[in-house]
């Protein structure tokens, strides 16, 4: 798709470059195009077209093409003049961008003049710069036909046409050319002159211009297509000039309505005649997207996820390297010196700008095609560099340049790389300006005399065959050798130093003596002995010149003025020449190779955009050096860009970062978040209700395009549009479920107005598929009623687990292990075939498996896992930045404590005392009234107690009471009772406090001792477990030691020493003994390898289990019981251990259970079933509730914890009773069967005892883990249940005389401050602003008197 926005340069501010006329031109008419009130209505096919050569019957299909946007406006570009033309008519907005194309709705103005029907409308012009270097398409009505031409017109500066019906005082003038312009297309088309409206559909795609037309019906039909190879950037409608006629008779009006096209997807409906009867623009509305998604013009009721109408980029970021020079490719291509195919030339262009449209205009192009590259993508793209090769084309060899050809031009001159992204340009230059440069590029050809060709100016040299030689090649024979030749004596000469003479042999036949036989006869092309000829025929490679032409060595020797080796011109073979001239022009081939597409600074500037500011934090369209997309730019600090790099990619090739050369800032590019849009559509409604999931309406309104709706609100699911918020209303059935218990309900318009008078038929309501009370009234169990236990309380447990994930690698030199360095053993071992190779192969596989296993474990640990090197099971410590304090909550006596303010601490004396449970209750009882002291006596374990601290008031009161009782006995004896009770109760309070403290001390001592014992046992078990881990490591070494010990085993031979065997026995017997030893050692080695295979299987399984536990236990919380520890998983920690991983799991285990009645499901009203979701239905007090499976927590049954069933039936499957056959077959007696085969045969079996010490050690940490578990239980049981002794703070008020002293001191302070301010000069300025509140004695009596007089 072409998206071309072409900005005319200031030097081309007018249309065309030739003033056809200067008369009656002004700039007074400031008319602007009218905007239509009607919009593009595609429902009847307006704006669509019939695809070329395709017929569809009775079908609905999606089609992507160039269409107008549904609902877009038209612009009227028709202009009508009489005498004057306005210069403003030839500038924007009348001069418009063509971009992808336009759709035109043209009024056919019909007028009868002198009984003659005239059909008139304006002429449209589509082109680029409108001069004779580019093609311009003109569509002009003329006498009832359409004249359509595509020529290289020289357009007038102010072009116009004239009326045919009324005439015009102006002459039609819109182009002027000194000769007939070059045209690609000229054709006349008829049209219906009686039609009221004509419709035109013009668009361009990949350099091809398409035209469609209709005068009856809305969809247009194919008119013509034309390959231009260039981009059409602008169009305008030429003014139509007519003679001025009075307005009452002038009923000729012009209307030329135009709307732009873009690449869009349409849903088209074809009837039984293949006619388009309905169409939908898929991206014009939410409803249209649903229609296209379902490929139906009447979608069914449902909820649809939409992808369109989401992201609305608010800006465009465009970047190119500024101030780069022009590549000037056209200057190099038009150079008059043109090379031949033999010495083709190459030029590399980089860090520059080029304009492909201009290039193709400035070069006389015959054809331009591309390979592995869409040539439309070149416009506006950037590359690392552009490599351009060129040479003149021999006329007879033009076909050799077809891609994949094996003709002479590509096999022996220039090879076209069909795997690269390239374009092939065929062009020509005028004959008078061309000089063909024929030059031999071969260095070894030129060494021996051939560097240029003596041909005419337009003859082009090319190679038929190419040859390569060694650097020491010389075509001349050695004179000292050939001087003895009697016949066939070749020419000879002295070869250059460092080269080899031509190979010649002296031969004698029956008739001739000393006959010379030399290489490469008769010539290198048709030599008899190609293997001995040093000139090798080759095919040129990509980017290579021909290495050299062939040399007839019989014509190389001493020449005139050349004493050294020299070849005559006719000695060089395998080349031809032909003319490049055709129609007085020389044909040239050029190959453009585009390197690094969208990754460099060699850019096409056809689009002529300017660099823009970078908008951050919002969704934008971007074009970064040819790479386009949408994203959100966020400025970051990055130091990983080199000076020549500016784009950052991810592993999938997507651009994720950008360095701006203009500002030297770096950005990360994030995808535009659009959210998920769900459309709830009710069949036959005019529009759907929309839910932008997880987005606020404020974000939707500001960043996402949508059709304006008066109803929108934020919900739990996201922003809801075109619906009314009625979540307080619930429905039991729903066709438009939105999830999470919400529903979109649709009410018919008539009933809606009667009930609520709202304008939206959609309501956002709560979905409740059943009523809980109804369920309890009519419920029946499904599958029966069962009794199970569900946990109610838990305790935390710890569990340590070691998993072996690797082992030491082992490699064995099998031959050395069996035979050491004895040759006889090695010879005999070779007869065992590939046994040793198999052993090494198996061990290599074991080592590879260890590497893979370690890599898998490392990858699992590297992603989000913190390995600890100092783990501790004590929860009060931190493990590598893992702080458990926030998980433990508040610990100690300060939890929940409150304190008074700083002022209260200043004004009162604070006293703290221990509280075993009665001080706070006493304080609450008194409420601050000290007279209620004895009324608030507390009881502690049956003993009356009071707090042991008294205030000054209480001491005074009780002292007075005791004094009165002592002064007037017995009448005042009763006054001493309160004093006695007060003393006794407070002594009781001290006693019980000391008793509790004593008991707590004993509990602390016992629990601490028990905790120390448990900790000791736990560390002992951990130490034992680590010792077993160490034993696993030692076991591998022990296995190797056992294997080495087998070297000293005789395995039935007379000795384990090969030297002793050889010295004691003869050759044959020695071989037998060595063979026994080899068999034994190979058997031991085979056993060891088998053990290694068995061990690696266990290690691999352990590694897989470790990876699974890292992923499920360490990185997340496992739902499986007893998988991560014992019980329900809480968290797990992992640390490295020798050849494995050590896990520490924390879990909670049930300590108490509740027995309940459960049912697998419930049946509602006999026809509808529900099943629990991750829990149980329990029967509690004749009512059904739901609880989770891992913890007893009853809650009401709702749609969030149930799964619905279609019926209440239960399908039972009976397991078949199948037993494995464990009977033992009845075999014949072994001795009897053996005797049948070995009658009268006696043999003594050798003693092949094999003392195997290879043992596979498995970890058995069961006992240690049990000890650790018991220690943990012991620690849990050692919890110190102390009697709670609180700390109570009591504030004692000061006596009255202290307060009196404070007040007196404060008054004295104020008086001193007052006299300081009034009696010194320090406060005069302040008091003058207070209107003389204090009189001053001196200097201002007049003012005082005057003020008194005024009063």
From Swiss-Prot:
Q: Where are the transmembrane segments?
A: 1296-1316
As for membrane topology, the entry says: Single-pass type I membrane protein
Chief subcellular location = virion
Per UniProt, residues of the BetaCoV S1-NTD domain are 14-294
Q: Where is this site: Cleavage?
A: 756-757, 900-901
SUPFAM superfamilies the record matches: Coronavirus S2 glycoprotein, SARS receptor-binding domain-like
> Which region is the signal sequence?
1-12
Keyword Metal-binding part of the UniProt annotation: no
Q: How is it modified after translation?
A: Specific enzymatic cleavages in vivo yield mature proteins. The precursor is processed into S1 and S2 by host cell furin or another cellular protease to yield the mature S1 and S2 proteins. Additionally, a second cleavage leads to the release of a fusion peptide after viral attachment to host cell receptor. The cytoplasmic Cys-rich domain is palmitoylated. Spike glycoprotein is digested within host endosomes.
| Region described as Heptad repeat 2: spans on this chain | 1245-1284
In this chain the BetaCoV S1-CTD domain maps to: 325-605
List the residue ranges of the region (Fusion peptide 2). 920-940
Extract the coiled-coil ranges from the record.
Answer: 1030-1074, 1257-1285
For this record, the Gene Ontology CC terms, alphabetical, are:
host cell endoplasmic reticulum-Golgi intermediate compartment membrane; host cell plasma membrane; membrane; viral envelope; virion membrane
Q: Which Pfam families match?
A: bCoV_S1_N (PF16451), bCoV_S1_RBD (PF09408), CoV_S1_C (PF19209), CoV_S2 (PF01601), CoV_S2_C (PF19214)
Q: Where in the cell is it found?
A: Virion membrane; Host endoplasmic reticulum-Golgi intermediate compartment membrane; Host cell membrane
Assembly mode: Homotrimer; each monomer consists of a S1 and a S2 subunit. The resulting peplomers protrude from the virus surface as spikes.
What the record says about family reads: Belongs to the betacoronaviruses spike protein family.
Give any extra note attached to this record.
Answer: Isolate N5 belongs to genotype C. Genotype C probably arose from recombination between genotypes A and B.
Recorded protein name is: Spike glycoprotein
């Amino acid at each position: 798709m072409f998206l071309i926005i072409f900005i005319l340069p200031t030097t081309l501010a007018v249309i065309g470059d030739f003033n056809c006329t200067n008369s009656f031109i002004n700039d007074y008419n400031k008319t602007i195009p009218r905007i239509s009130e009607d919009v593009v209505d595609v429902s009847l096919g307006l704006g669509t077209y019939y695809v070329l050569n395709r017929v569809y019957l009775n079908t609905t299909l999606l089609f992507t093409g160039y269409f107008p946007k549904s609902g877009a406006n038209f612009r009227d570009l028709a202009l009508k003049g009489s005498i004057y033309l306005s210069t403003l008519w030839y500038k924007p907005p009348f001069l418009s961008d063509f971009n992808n194309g336009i759709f035109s709705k043209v009024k056919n103005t019909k007028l009868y003049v002198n009984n003659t029907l005239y059909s008139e409308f304006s002429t449209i012009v589509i082109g680029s710069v409108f001069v004779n270097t580019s093609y311009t398409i003109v569509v002009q009505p003329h006498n009832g036909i359409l004249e359509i031409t595509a020529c290289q017109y020289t357009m007038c500066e102010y072009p116009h046409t004239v009326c045919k019906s009324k005439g015009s005082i102006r002459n039609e003038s819109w182009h002027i050319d000194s000769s007939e312009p070059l045209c690609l297309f000229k054709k006349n088309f008829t049209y219906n002159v009686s039609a009221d409206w004509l419709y035109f559909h013009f668009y361009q795609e990949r350099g091809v211009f398409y035209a469609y037309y209709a005068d009856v019906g809305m969809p247009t039909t194919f008119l013509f297509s034309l390959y231009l190879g260039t981009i059409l950037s602008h169009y305008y409608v030429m003014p139509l000039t007519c003679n001025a006629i009075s307005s009452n008779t002038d009923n000729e009006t012009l209307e030329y309505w135009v709307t732009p096209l873009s690449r869009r997807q349409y849903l088209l409906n074809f009837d039984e005649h293949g006619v388009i009867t309905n169409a939908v623009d898929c991206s014009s509305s939410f409803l249209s997207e649903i229609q296209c998604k379902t490929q139906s013009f009447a979608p069914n009721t449902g909820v649809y996820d939409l992808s369109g109408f989401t992201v609305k980029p608010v800006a465009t970021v465009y970047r190119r390297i500024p101030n780069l020079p022009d590549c000037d490719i056209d200057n190099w291509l038009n150079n008059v010196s043109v090379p031949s195919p033999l010495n083709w030339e190459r030029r590399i262009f980089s860090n520059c700008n080029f304009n492909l449209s201009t290039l193709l205009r400035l070069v006389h192009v015959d054809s331009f095609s591309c390979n592995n590259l869409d040539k439309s993508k070149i416009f506006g793209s950037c590359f690392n560099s552009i490599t351009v090769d060129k040479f003149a084309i021999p006329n007879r060899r033009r076909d050799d340049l077809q891609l994949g050809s094996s003709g002479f031009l590509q096999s022996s001159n220039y090879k076209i790389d069909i795997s690269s992204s390239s374009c092939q340009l065929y062009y020509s230059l005028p004959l008078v300006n061309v000089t063909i440069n024929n030059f031999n590029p071969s260095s070894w050809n030129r060494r021996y005399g051939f560097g240029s060709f003596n041909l005419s100016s337009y003859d082009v040299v090319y190679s038929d065959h190419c040859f390569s030689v060694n650097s020491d090649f010389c075509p001349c024979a050695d004179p000292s050798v050939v001087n003895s030749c009697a016949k066939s004596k070749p020419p000879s000469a002295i070869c250059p130093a460092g080269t080899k003479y031509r190979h010649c042999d002296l031969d004698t036949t029956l008739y001739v003596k000393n006959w010379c036989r030399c290489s490469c006869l008769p010539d290198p092309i048709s030599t008899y002995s190609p293997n001995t000829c040093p000139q090798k025929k080759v095919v040129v490679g990509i980017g290579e010149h021909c290495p050299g032409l062939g040399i007839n060595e019989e014509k190389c020797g001493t020449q005139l003025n050349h004493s050294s080796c020299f070849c005559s011109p006719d000695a060089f073979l395998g080349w031809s020449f032909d003319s490049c001239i055709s129609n007085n022009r020389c044909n040239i081939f050029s190959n453009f190779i585009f390197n690094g597409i969208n990754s460099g600074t060699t850019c096409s500037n056809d689009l002529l955009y300017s660099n823009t500011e970078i908008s951050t934090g919002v969704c934008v369209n971007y074009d970064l050096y040819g790479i386009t997309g949408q994203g959100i730019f966020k400025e970051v600090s990055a130091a990983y860009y080199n000076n020549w790099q500016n784009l950052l990619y991810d592993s999938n090739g997507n651009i994720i970062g950008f360095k701006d050369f203009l500002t030297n800032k770096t950005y990360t590019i994030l995808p535009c978040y659009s959210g998920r849009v769900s459309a709830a559509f009710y069949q036959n409604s005019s529009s759907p209700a929309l839910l932008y999931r997880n987005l606020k309406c404020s974000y939707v309104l500001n960043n996402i395009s949508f059709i304006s709706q008066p109803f929108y609100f934020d919900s739990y699911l996201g922003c809801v549009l075109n619906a009314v918020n009625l979540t307080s209303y619930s429905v039991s059935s729903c066709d438009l479920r939105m999830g999470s218990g919400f529903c979109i309900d649709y009410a018919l318009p008539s009933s809606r107005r009667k009930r609520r008078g709202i304008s939206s038929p959609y309501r956002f309501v709560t979905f409740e598929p059943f009523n809980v009370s109804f369920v309890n009234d009519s419920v029946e169990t499904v599958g029966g009623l069962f009794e199970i236990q569900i946990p109610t309380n838990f305790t935390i447990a710890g569990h340590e687990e070691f998993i072996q994930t690797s082992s030491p690698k082992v490699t064995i030199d099998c031959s050395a292990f069996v035979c050491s360095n004895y040759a006889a053993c090695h010879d005999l071992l070779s007869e065992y075939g590939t046994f040793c190779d198999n052993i090494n192969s198996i061990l290599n596989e074991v080592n590879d498996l260890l590497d893979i296993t370690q890599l898998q474990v490392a990858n699992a640990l590297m992603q989000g896992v913190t390995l600890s090197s100092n783990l501790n099971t004590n929860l009060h410590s931190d493990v590598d930045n893992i702080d458990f304090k926030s998980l433990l909550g508040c610990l100690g006596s300060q939890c929940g404590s409150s304190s008074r303010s700083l002022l209260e601490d200043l004004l009162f004396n604070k006293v703290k005392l221990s509280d075993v449970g009665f001080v706070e209750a006493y304080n609450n009882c008194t409420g601050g009234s000290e007279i209620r002291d004895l009324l608030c006596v507390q009881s502690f374990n049956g003993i009356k107690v009071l707090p042991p601290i008294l205030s000054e008031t209480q001491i005074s009161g009780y002292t007075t009471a005791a004094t009165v009782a002592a002064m007037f006995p017995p009448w005042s004896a009763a006054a001493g009772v309160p004093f006695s009770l007060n003393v006794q109760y407070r002594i009781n309070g001290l006693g019980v406090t000391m008793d509790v403290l004593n008991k707590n001390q004993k509990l602390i001592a016992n629990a601490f001792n028990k905790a120390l014992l448990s900790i000791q046992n736990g560390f002992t078990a951990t130490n034992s477990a680590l010792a077993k881990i160490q034993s696993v490591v030692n076991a591998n070494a022990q296995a190797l030691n056992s294997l080495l010990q087998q070297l000293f085993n005789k395995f039935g031979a007379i000795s384990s020493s090969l030297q002793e065997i050889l010295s004691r026995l003869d050759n044959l017997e020695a071989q037998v003994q060595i063979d026994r030893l080899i068999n034994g050692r190979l058997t031991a080695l085979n056993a060891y390898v088998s053990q290694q295979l068995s061990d690696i299987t266990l290690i691999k399984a352990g590694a897989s289990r470790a990876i699974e536990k890292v992923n499920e236990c360490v990185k997340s919380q496992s739902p499986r019981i007893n998988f991560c520890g014992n019980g329900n998983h809480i968290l797990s920690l992992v640390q490295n251990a020798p050849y494995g991983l050590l896990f520490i799991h924390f879990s909670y285990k049930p300590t108490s259970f509740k027995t309940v009645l459960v049912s697998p499901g419930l049946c509602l009203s006999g026809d509808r079933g529900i099943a629990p979701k991750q829990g149980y239905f329990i029967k509690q007090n004749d009512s059904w509730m739901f609880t989770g499976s891992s913890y007893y927590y009853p809650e009401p049954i709702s749609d969030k914890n149930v799964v619905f069933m279609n019926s209440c039936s239960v399908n039972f499957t009976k397991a078949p009773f199948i037993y494995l056959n464990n009977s033992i077959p009845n075999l014949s007696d072994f001795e009897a069967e053996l005797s049948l085969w070995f009658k009268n045969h006696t043999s003594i079996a050798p003693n092949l005892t094999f003392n195997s010490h290879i043992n596979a050690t498995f970890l058995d940490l069961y006992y240690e883990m049990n000890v650790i578990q018991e220690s943990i239980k012991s620690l849990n049981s050692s919890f110190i249940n102390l009697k709670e002794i609180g700390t109570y703070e009591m504030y004692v008020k000061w006596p009255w005389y202290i307060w009196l002293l404070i007040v007196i001191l404060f008054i004295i302070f104020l008086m001193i401050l007052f006299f300081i301010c009034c009696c010194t000069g320090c406060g005069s300025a302040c008091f003058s602003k207070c209107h003389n509140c204090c009189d001053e004695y001196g200097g201002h009596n007049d003012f005082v008197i005057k003020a008194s007089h005024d009063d």
